[in-house]
Amino acid sequence: MYAVIKTGGQQFKVKQGTILKIEKLEIEPGKKVTFKEVLIVSDGDDIQVGTPFVSKVTVEAKIISQGKGKKVHILKFRRRKHSMKQQGHRQLLTEIEIVKINA
């Protein structure tokens, strides 16, 4: 059984036990979170596609940790001016484990 959930402007295909890194959620590690925006649910040959979401289906997950992603380096170089600007960014992420798909 798998489901496709929407969180943080992205879509993820999840199964029970899947570990994901998603956009930061303001929830402490160890707590549970429920995703109600489920786009697709599949149980073998039975597939339910939502318009836009499947009704009465939720996905429960447990927060494992909060952290940051890999650093992205940005370099703006101005030709013939002997000038450049260097910057970095690390996205805040939440690591979750899918506990249960309630279909």
Curated annotation (Swiss-Prot):
KW Ribosomal protein (keyword) present: yes
Keywords per UniProt: Ribonucleoprotein, Ribosomal protein, RNA-binding, rRNA-binding
Domain of life, per lineage: Bacteria
Pfam families in UniProt: Ribosomal_L21p
GO BP, sorted A to Z: translation
Coiled coil (residue ranges): none
Keyword Ribosomal protein: yes
A GO molecular-function annotation: structural constituent of ribosome
GO cellular component, one term: ribonucleoprotein complex
Record function comment: This protein binds to 23S rRNA in the presence of protein L20.
Protein family (similarity comment): Belongs to the bacterial ribosomal protein bL21 family.
Quaternary assembly: Part of the 50S ribosomal subunit. Contacts protein L20.
Identification of the protein by name: Large ribosomal subunit protein bL21
Record organism: Vesicomyosocius okutanii subsp. Calyptogena okutanii (strain HA)
